[in-house]
Amino acid sequence: GMTVNSFASVSLNPALVLWSIEKKQPSFNNFLNSNGYAVNVLTKNQNNLCSLFSSPIEDKFKNLKWDLSESGHPIIHDTLAWFDCVKWNYYDGGDHQILVGEVKSHSHVEKEPLLYWNSKIS
């Protein structure tokens, strides 16, 4: 897992989303060779998870409460929202790879989001 600073909707029908990963990231090949991914949107009170997933720690899920989605991707408990995605297509984007996934399932709750704005996380 990793922390990303941008995530976007691509299409409503089919439901497609995207994010990008720098090709130098240690987990780059894991994501590139996977059948998809989960996006877990953090709440305002989950700044610690943002820091954890941006760290070099290998087993980031070790002390977390999480379940596998129907597609086999990790869904972290108590997040604002999650999207379970299967690989639609991946595109070259210079020093990044753009990962487009088809949303197979999702969920959300009414909580305040964790935001990154003006070079600050809050």
Model-assigned labels for residue ranges:
Residues 1-122:
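Basic, polyanion-binding surface patches
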